[in-house]
Curated annotation (Swiss-Prot):
InterPro entries on file: A-D-PHexomutase_a/b/a-I (IPR005844), A-D-PHexomutase_a/b/a-I/II/III (IPR016055), A-D-PHexomutase_a/b/a-II (IPR005845), A-D-PHexomutase_a/b/a-III (IPR005846), A-D-PHexomutase_C (IPR005843), A-D-PHexomutase_C_sf (IPR036900), Alpha-D-phosphohexomutase_SF (IPR005841), GlmM_bact (IPR006352)
EC code: 5.4.2.10
The record's account of how the chain is modified after translation: Activated by phosphorylation.
Keyword Metal-binding listed: yes
Isomerase among keywords: yes
Superkingdom assignment: Bacteria
Keywords: Isomerase, Magnesium, Metal-binding, Phosphoprotein
One GO cellular component, as annotated: cytosol
Chain residues that bind Mg(2+): S105, D252, D254, D256
Gene3D superfamilies found in the cross-reference section: Alpha-D-Glucose-1,6-Bisphosphate, subunit A, domain 3, Alpha-D-phosphohexomutase, C-terminal domain
The protein's name in its UniProt record: Phosphoglucosamine mutase
Species classification: Bacteria, Bacillati, Actinomycetota, Actinomycetes, Bifidobacteriales
Enzyme class: isomerase
Amino acid sequence: MPRMFGTDGVRGLANRDLTAQLALDLGDAAVRVLGDDERSEFESRRRALVGRDTRVSGDFLAAALSAGMSAGGFDVIDAGIIPTPGVAYLTSVLNVEMGAVISASHNPMPDNGIKFFARGGFKLPDTKEDEIEAVLGQDWDRPTGAGVGRVSHDTATATNLYIDHLVSAIAPVGPDKSQPTPLKGLKIVADCANGATSVVAPEALRRAGADVTVINASPDGYNINKNAGSTHPEQLQAMVKASGAVMGVAFDGDADRCLAVDEDGNMVNGDQIMGILARAKKNAGKLNHDTLVVTVMSNLGLKLALRSMGIKTVQTNVGDRYVLEEMLRGDYSLGGEQSGHVINREFATTGDGTLTALTLCNEVVKSGKSLKELAADFPQLPQTLINVPNVDKMAAKTNAKVQAAVEREEKLLGDTGRVLLRPSGTEPLVRVMAEAETQQQADEVCDRLAKVVADELTL
């Protein structure tokens, strides 16, 4: 049977795949697996924290998840609507034993998901998720009487703690308790995707001094990600040009990612954002080992540009959890994905879109350059991606003819391009990607390779 937990928790159609009963059972199982014995003498009660995005199904799922946790003896802090990285931060700063987020990120509104954070605010490794799945729905000696947990609701306190943390990343409060405003006069547009950062991002940017025009920050339970945010940036691009803003930032539904738009409405992707921030950290002496952690999907153009700046790259599989694992293993300080997940370990344990927006805006101000100028230092090689369906995806790395074709194309491209075959994690298809000096060459290489994959691996 396939694992219940995917690359980012448990996801599915709310009230069909992800039911109230399943949420209850997940809460019940999580307290058994994630409850630890590291409590200090002052921690008489076990505690968990739950947050969610703006989907209408989040209400009943949060209630069910919290019920499972409290029935297992945990006092639950319901932080209400708050970005995923906010839950990670609060799990750490409040020193609770675990955190949980109810969100399906950039997925359509009818979907939802549940993912957990361990003490310290880190996503769970596969082994812990498997332990939760193994005890799911099992009976056990649950507490009674005073051993049963309570559920408290405190959205305002949780949100304010998180906003304070975000702003302090670029504007630490001075000894006189005054709040610096490093973004003063910076005119920007923020697209909140009608999601979890609809309150947090505008407030954090304004407190840092920015002149912010906010769009898609009126969630109604049904409009999350709908023609908005990082997956649909067209409205943001138009607003930046129409308003005369110097840049724009776009978040997804749970605000763990951020993409940007320059003053001409051109997209600035996660690779370019990482490049800008990596160079800034290196110049400040804060880029550990002069290395940026990226995934296999990061554009070769980023790696070539960074190499010319004396910055190395380490590559992982797709998924911000794998980026973080490598960052922890190698003691690296910055990493992320082309999709806009950026992990800044100085301030966060997971991708944080609002933090990325603040630090990117800060670098624009400090550099004295426009975002367009900064992004131009990290040109992207033309890229073509073809999905080849209905194939034996597991044979992509072992089929002799496919591997011979890969070697031919790699030899043809040399150091000026690359190819990548990536089996889908959920479907019987292989993603064929090619990067080259020209779009025509990328198209031709990708077409040839996709044909070989189809001819050799079709089921």
